[in-house]
Amino acid sequence: AAVVVLMVLSSPGTEGGNSERHFVSQFKGECYFTNGTQRIRSVDRYIYNREEYLRFDSDVGEYRAVTELGRSDAEYYNKQYLERTRAELDTVCRHNYEGVETPTSLRRLEQPNVVISLSRTEALNHHNTLVCSVTDFYPAKIKVRWFRNGQEETVGVSSTQLIRNGDWTFQVLVMLEMAPRRGEVYTCHVEHPSLKSPITVEWRAQSESARSKMLSGIGGCVLGVIFLGLGLFIRYRSQKGPRGPPPAGLLQ
């Protein structure tokens, strides 16, 4: 968020003495951006002696008193400045974001790559760990969830800290402790500001026999292609006409 702070100090002398009392008034104007300018929120804060007493939040749409001190100001500002303050969402926040002063890093969006892997060789009904690797995303804000057969899993879920890559993108690993059963479908669900819709990657549990049958089928197809090619080659050679008789001189 971009923050502007205005501080005003006043130090009136105390009657009958030389000591001074200091009063600090602060104003903070804050702009919050989600996915570029897709969603913008503007917040104005009024603070007196380190205590916020009045606030305007664009999500609320009007000035609200935070303490009793701000009640009269809230009524006055809502009558005199409300429309102008509401317009600052575009005239200040959006304008500054799209202007030349906006850092490139604020506008940068990199979509994550998502891959699921199993920590150990699959064995049904045995304890195992699924790892959802989410890499190369920016900005850092991201939400990764696990689902089993459409239901969110919250038990047995753990995550690494965000890891910063050399190009300023990030990566994170989110693990799920589980004991897979045949037919179960596990889904890694990823939400990120760079995405219009979440990324979902599925992993399906299958028995060793099913895996062996699948590998055998793939191997059979490969061998079939090899033998087919060999048969076509032999047929091609056999279709060539017989060679003519050798010259008479050679027969003698």
UniProtKB/Swiss-Prot annotation:
**Residue span of region Beta-1:** 17-109
Q: Which domain of life is it from?
A: Eukaryota
Recorded hits in SUPFAM superfamilies, A to Z, give: Immunoglobulin (SSF48726), MHC antigen-recognition domain (SSF54452)
Q: Topology in the membrane?
A: Single-pass type I membrane protein
Q: Quick one: where's region Beta-2?
A: 110-203
Q: Which residues lie on this side of the membrane: Extracellular?
A: 17-213
SS bonds (residue pairs): 31-93, 132-188
Q: Which PROSITE patterns match?
A: IG_LIKE (PS50835), IG_MHC (PS00290)
Topological region Cytoplasmic: 235-252
The record's section on InterPro entries has: Ig-like_dom (IPR007110), Ig-like_dom_sf (IPR036179), Ig-like_fold (IPR013783), Ig/MHC_CS (IPR003006), Ig_C1-set (IPR003597), MHC/Immunoglobulin (IPR050160), MHC_I/II-like_Ag-recog (IPR011162), MHC_II_a/b_N (IPR014745)
According to its UniProt entry, one GO biological process term is: antigen processing and presentation of exogenous peptide antigen via MHC class II
What broad class describes the main subcellular location of this protein? Answer: membrane
Ordered alphabetically, the record's keywords are:
Adaptive immunity, Disulfide bond, Glycoprotein, Immunity, Membrane, MHC II, Signal, Transmembrane, Transmembrane helix, Ubl conjugation
Gene Ontology molecular-function annotations: peptide antigen binding
> Which SMART domains does the annotation name?
IGc1 (SM00407), MHC_II_beta (SM00921)
Residues making up the signal peptide according to the UniProt record: 1-16
**Domain Ig-like C1-type residue range list:** 112-200
Q: Name the family.
A: Belongs to the MHC class II family.
Instruction: Kindly provide the name given to this protein in its UniProt entry.
Output: H-2 class II histocompatibility antigen, A-F beta chain
Q: What organism is this sequence from?
A: Mus musculus (Mouse)
